[in-house]
Structure formats: C-alpha cells, structure tokens
A protein has these predicted regions:
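Short, glycine/charged-rich "phosphate-handling" switch motifs in NTP-dependent
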Residues: 101
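Active-site beta3 strand of CheY-like receiver
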Residues: 48-54, 59
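Acidic catalytic/metal-coordinating carboxylates
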Residues: 36-37, 63-66
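C-terminal output helix
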Residues: 90, 108-117
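Short amphipathic alpha-helix used as the core "switch/output" element in two-component signaling
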Residues: 43, 65-76
Length: 125
C-alpha cells in the first residue's frame, strides 16, 4: 500500500506567508501547494482536493467568503481553516456557517495551526 502525505493547500495573497507556511508544513511531513488567487485554487480543486485548506479571507480576486460559498456550491468537500489578519465582528461565525472548521488570527501561532490541521487530518483518517 502506498502512503501519501496529506495535501495542504494555502490560499494567501502574501507571498511571504505562503512561503513561510509551505516551509513550516513541509517540515512536518505535509505536501503543500500554494495559491495567490482564489480562482487558481478553485480550478485546482476540480482535479485534486486537498486534505486541508488554509484560507485567507482578504484576497484580490475572490475573497475567502466567496471561496467557501463556491466550494459549497460545487459540492467540493474541503476541510477549511480560515486565517486572517483582519478580524471583524461576526467573521468567525460567518465562515463556520459556510463550512469552515476553524478560524485563526495572524500572526499565526504554530501550535494552534498544527493542532487545527492535526484535528482535520485525524478526523479524515
């Protein structure tokens, strides 16, 4: 039986954030793909769904809320952890209503991030 590493997709328009998350997650054995645009992520999900999506809310093309809505409309079941540096009242509740499993604030706490991803990976196993 071939073991595959869990695939984590990162959607963030900040290149430094994508690079830092990619480096961190790879050290923990995850396969990582990064996207700077929501449209790119949605196109990629049509061919391969990630085990977990780290989703920034504020994006230049399609915001995180719209990404969640489109994933749901396309019946693409992806476990999502929202990451944002722009917390607003009601955001956490809104993203959870759209299907996100967790909501984390930037700057990210490595322990909290890994716990959120670990919970998703364990549940899927």
């Amino acid at each position: 039986m071939i073991q595959t590493r869990p695939l984590i997709a990162v959607l963030d328009d900040e290149p430094q954030m994508c690079k830092a998350l990619g480096r961190l997650l790879k050290t923990y054995g995850f396969e990582v793909v990064t996207f700077a645009l929501g449209a790119e992520l949605l196109a990629a999900c049509a061919s391969r769904l990630p085990n977990c999506l780290l989703l920034d809310l504020h994006m230049p093309d399609i915001n995180g809320f719209e990404v969640l809505e489109r994933l749901g409309a396309q019946n693409l079941r992806v476990s999502v952890v929202v990451i944002t540096g722009h917390d607003q009242p009601g955001n956490a509740e809104r993203v959870r209503a759209l299907g996100a499993l967790d909501y984390l604030l930037k700057p990210l706490n490595e322990t909290q991030l890994l716990a959120a991803i670990g919970k998703i990976i364990q549940t899927a196993a």
